[in-house]
Amino acid sequence: MDAYLKKQFDFTGVKAALLVEQSILVILRDNKPDIPWPNTWELPGGGREGQETPLECLQREVWEELGLTLKEESIIWSKIYPSMLDKDRSAVFVVCQISQEQYREIRFGDEGQEFKLMPVEDFIKAEGVIPQLQERVRDYVEKK
């Protein structure tokens, strides 16, 4: 795991590609006109609270959205990118491997309409997916 995931620095939040074998867990955003990318497929994660480290932010967001306790050992890749909402700041993107059993244990929270598994290659090419997240997953696939 990259050391910066346990350090405090200025970042806006964390998004996570949660892989279950060759598929990625996706969430359909709420269809509300007052949020960015309404009714669009995205990945778990969100904004930093207080002085969280990237790992703390990731673990809190995944717990809130999916009811999963994400162990740091599940992180297989990470990279810092420009924030999707503020290009002058940084955001963290991580790729994690979770088991079928963990996937079955998901308790979907109150953010988003639904979740499902999508083949990674389909996610990269699909319409209706946040483009920056497609690029980040593509980076992982090309560099692994």
Feature annotation, model-predicted:
Residues 11, 19, 38-43, 87-91:
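Short connector loops at helix/strand junctions that flank enzyme active sites
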Residues 8, 16-17, 32-33, 83-84, ...:
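Short secondary-structure boundary/capping segments
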Residues 103-109, 126-130:
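Short, charged, solvent-exposed linker or helix-capping segments at domain edges/interfaces
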Residues 23-64:
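Conserved Nudix-box catalytic region and its N-terminal flanking loop in Nudix hydrolases
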Residues 69-79:
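A short coil-to-beta-strand element that immediately follows conserved catalytic motifs
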Residues 20-22, 79-104, 116, 120-122, ...:
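Active-site-adjacent beta-strand/loop module that shapes the phosphate/pyrophosphate-binding cleft
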Residues 48, 123-124:
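A generic structural signal for short hydrophobic patches within well-formed alpha-helices
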